[in-house]
């Protein structure tokens, strides 16, 4: 069979193109190198790093890439012990298989599945896995979640958004004096933020329904963005009763864990806003699933957060990629953890908006030496919160 009539120039050109394709698809294509690393990377160590009432979780790998997450809302010594034990489930696993590892830890023990100790620890592990994966690909975590849905993130508290706490506990029925005092505090808050600012009232589960219903009617003229934690988590019937009698939007979710505890609020249509906490509900992985569920019911997220800059930044990554979002709780004054422990790379502007966190990964630098100083400070150690009524009986916290 005769060979096709191809010029020498065409042959050289095609050979050069083949060589170029091979180079681009190989060593000079950073994506290929990253893909190779994500295939061979393994978890080699998981270390709890206590710091006052918080515990940081450090996950190390055989490629020298390290991720960090934060445990909050647990007794630190117990949390640290559980994380140390859970390493057995994570050893030699690929940290980029985030969903697989989430399921492995969550389902590992039938008697701990869904409980606060396991889910809070899993939340920190999940943050650290996303941190590692973002660092491997050299991008902020929100890029891995589908990219940002907004250019900046509205936050509170700040000069443009004020949250008034209930300051309880309160007995079953409030007196006119107690109601008037709460109304006065809310009126003062409205003055602080002005007519364009956001005003939030946190009932903190310490206001019984009769007081809350009275109060909601009295503060309606102050344009409240939402009432937070109006009932003990999971008490759907009370939420339904309050939803029928209160015109201000109701919000809850900070102490509910995973999609399975959030779903009843949506199905019963007894709240207007969901407040998942990235450190309570199962980490970034669960935050994105909760956001998708809530979006189907047209319920926006206003995530709760009382974590340091590490956990807070994880939450910011999640909401950056969440379409239906209202506002993020974000404490930036350093009272939760000294600012030198976890150094962030985002700022809140004069209008109360946080810039998008930059990567790679979470984009937070952890100073383990500074964290150790917090752990050694007797004034910053964990104390069990016990709230009592005037008669000595135990109140909800």
Region locations from a protein language model:
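Glycine-rich, aromatic-flanked loop segments that form ligand/cofactor-binding clefts
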Residues: 126-161
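Metal- or metallocofactor-binding catalytic centers and their adjacent structured scaffolds
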Residues: 62-137, 395
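Extended hydrophobic packing segments that form well-structured cores
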Residues: 362-397
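Shared catalytic-loop signature of beta/alpha-barrel
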Residues: 84, 88, 93, 100, ...
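N-terminal secretory signal peptides and thylakoid transit peptides that target proteins
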Residues: 1-19
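Metal-dependent enolase-superfamily TIM-barrel catalytic cores that perform enediolate-based chemistry
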Residues: 152-245
């Amino acid at each position: 069979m005769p060979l096709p009539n191809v010029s020498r120039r065409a042959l050289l050109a095609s050979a050069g193109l083949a060589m170029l394709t091979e180079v681009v698809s190989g060593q000079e294509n950073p994506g290929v190198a990253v893909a190779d690393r994500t295939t061979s990377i393994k978890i080699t160590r998981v270390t709890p790093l206590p710091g006052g009432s918080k515990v940081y979780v450090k996950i190390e790998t055989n490629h020298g890439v390290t991720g960090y997450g934060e445990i909050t809302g647990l007794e630190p010594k117990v949390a640290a012990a559980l994380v140390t034990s859970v390493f057995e489930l994570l050893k030699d696993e690929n940290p980029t298989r985030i969903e697989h590892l989430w399921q492995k830890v969550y389902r590992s023990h039938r008697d701990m599945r869904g409980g606060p100790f396991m889910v809070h620890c899993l939340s920190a592990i999940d943050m650290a896995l996303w941190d590692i994966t973002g660092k491997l690909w050299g991008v902020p975590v929100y890029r891995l979640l589908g990219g940002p849905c907004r250019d900046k993130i509205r936050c509170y508290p700040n000069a443009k958004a004020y949250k008034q706490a209930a300051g309880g506990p309160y007995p079953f029925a409030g007196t006119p004096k107690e109601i008037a005092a709460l109304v006065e505090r809310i009126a003062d808050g409205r003055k602080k933020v002005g007519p364009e600012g956001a005003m939030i009232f946190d009932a903190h589960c310490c206001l019984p329904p009769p007081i809350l219903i009275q109060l909601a009617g009295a503060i309606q003229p102050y344009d409240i963005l939402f009432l937070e934690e109006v009932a003990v988590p999971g008490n759907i019937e009370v939420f339904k009763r309050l939803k029928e009698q209160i015109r201000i939007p109701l919000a809850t979710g900070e102490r509910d864990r995973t999609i399975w505890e959030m779903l009843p609020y949506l199905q019963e249509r007894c709240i207007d806003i969901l407040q998942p906490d990235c450190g309570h509900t199962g980490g970034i992985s669960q935050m994105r699933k909760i956001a998708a569920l809530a979006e189907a019911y047209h319920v926006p997220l206003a995530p709760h957060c009382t974590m340091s800059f590490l956990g807070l930044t994880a939450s910011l990554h999640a909401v950056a990629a969440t379409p239906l979002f209202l506002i993020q709780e974000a404490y930036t004054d350093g009272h939760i953890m000294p600012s030198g422990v976890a150094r962030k790379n985002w700022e809140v502007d004069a209008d109360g908006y946080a810039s998008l966190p930059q990567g790679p990964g979470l984009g937070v630098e952890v100073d383990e030496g500074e964290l150790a100083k917090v752990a050694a400070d007797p004034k910053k150690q964990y104390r069990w919160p016990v709230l009592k009524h005037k008669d000595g009986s135990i109140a909800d916290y």
